[in-house]
Amino acid sequence: MELQLFGINHKTSNVSDRERFIINESNQFLLNTLIKDKYKNIIFSFFGLSTCNRSEIYILGKKGVIKSFFEEASKLFYLNEINISQFYFLQDEDAFIHMCKVAAGIDSQVLGEQEIFGQYKNAITLSKSIGVMDSNLQRYANKAIEVVRKVRTNTNIGVNPLSISGLSLKLIKNIFENPIDQKILVIGAGSLAQDVIKNLYNKGVRDIRAVNRSVKEIIISDSFGIVSSPLSTLHS
């Protein structure tokens, strides 16, 4: 058995392509069915991780199976529309090192950001709860958690606790003396955009407008009182 992975992230692809490949609970059920149908006794366990900036699938299986699994997963999720050069494939020690870097925030857009660690642990919890991660893969995942804790204890990597959304708020504060008096436009409807809006709202900013390609895709709590509109109205 060998730890292997394939993924796509902010370094290899643009936002629109990353949005095509989301690993949620239902998609993991589909992957599990695929494995049972075509990779029985070849792939033994897996888990998926999706954040604003990456989607990755980690597997424990026979050596060299990751490319074949990617091809089948591509058919399942229509990933053929994305150029294969935007994906990366890692195996064995390289896969584990990458897992540790991701969980520690070393591979993040904001070096050392802490949000990814929680997302990583949530992904593990979900995969365990739906029965797609076995004890062998869990050992790798738990070992990565140990590594992250040592890294954050023994280095300065965790000194900056900010996420992308936190940095956005910090930048606004640096530019405007009174951020709560400003009119803020947020472009996008993903989890990152929603985190930015929540942070702004919690800091007292009330005049917020959110635009996206489709207004139907903007899902924000009504309690925020956000004005939502499609991207076509940006200049209106």
Predicted feature locations:
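Glycine-rich adenosine-cofactor-binding loop
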Residues: 144, 160-213
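Hydrophobic alpha-helical packing residues
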Residues: 35, 200-201, 221
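Short acidic low-complexity segments
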Residues: 222-236
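Short glycine-/acidic-enriched loop or helix-start segments at secondary-structure transitions
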Residues: 69, 196, 220
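Glycine/serine-rich phosphate-binding loop and adjoining beta1-alpha1 elements at the start
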Residues: 82-180
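Conserved beta-strand segments of alpha/beta enzyme cores
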Residues: 45, 207, 225-227
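A glycine-rich (often HGG/GG-containing) alpha/beta subdomain
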Residues: 1-108
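Short, charged/polar "capping" segments at the starts of alpha-helices
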Residues: 65, 215-220
